Curated annotation (Swiss-Prot):
One CC-aspect GO term: cytosol
Name of this chain's protein: Methionyl-tRNA formyltransferase
Role this protein plays: Attaches a formyl group to the free amino group of methionyl-tRNA(fMet). The formyl group appears to play a dual role in the initiator identity of N-formylmethionyl-tRNA by promoting its recognition by IF2 and preventing the misappropriation of this tRNA by the elongation apparatus.
Gene for this chain: fmt
GO MF entries: methionyl-tRNA formyltransferase activity
EC supergroup of this enzyme: transferase
Lineage: Bacteria, Pseudomonadati, Chlamydiota, Chlamydiia, Chlamydiales
Amino acid sequence: MSLRVVYLGTPQFAATVLKTLLDAHTHIVGVVTRADKPQKRSSKLISSPVKQLALSKNIPLLQPIKTTDPAFLAQLREWQADVFIVVAYGVILKQELLDIPTYGCYNLHAGLLPAYRGAAPIQRCIMDGGVLSGNTVIRMDAGMDTGDIANVNYVAIGEDMTAGGLAEALAASGGELLLKTLQEIEAGTVRHVPQNEAMATLAPKLTKEEGGIHWDAPASQVYAHIRGVSPAPGAWTRYLSQGKEARRLGVLSARMESFSGNYGDPGEVLGVSGEDLLIACRQGALRLRMVQPEGKASMKAKDFFNGQSRLVSKLF
């Protein structure tokens, strides 16, 4: 492939896709990623996974503070790219930048557009109980995920799949979809289909508070919520400690109880069942497997319960 490609991306998802392109000998003439960020509880700067991969391959790298900076835009022009590929870069790009490459900018979106436009298509699809996701490649315009569709693929959402697991599956197949798109661009056969605006939905970035579990819902819905916010921002609930103080409890993993009948009041702690802690929902129940009490390390849910002298009777 002779196309000159500039790649814009930041997290591990984008690094996985970039590796697929590099393994296929795509001509990546430059990489753009977000500026290094301080590590939590430390002043040490952390490089993005995309930066680490680009440096390991000796690919020219830019980390602009602002993508509207004239010096940055001038450097992009010097790379004389035929196409820009954007994957989870993390910044909405202005039209001046989008107009630089000969054939435009193409974005790999981890969702089936026009549904789930925004920063959290993977998480919100699972939280909504979705059973099918996929990648969409669009030719970018100045809107948020509103460009014409060039290619789509599909990935089934397993009944126990978390957002982290779906992200891995979408990244693995997304690189191949981009390779197909680049080949079509080079051959002049790529199609651009406008999105159906009537079908558009939004998927804004999740907040930590949205990880809160509402037990007054069917177990299937609660389980979808937990899977959708795993690993980030993470599911959580509250309990009354022995001193009757409300504390937060992170829920790291869970599974559905097979019987779907009524067990008790929503959030009621039904006790230890095997290795799990059984919690009643409005309909059915969930088995909590791994939890993380506030300010403590992760542990088995049954060990948490036993450590509280089995005095925790309800989660809320």
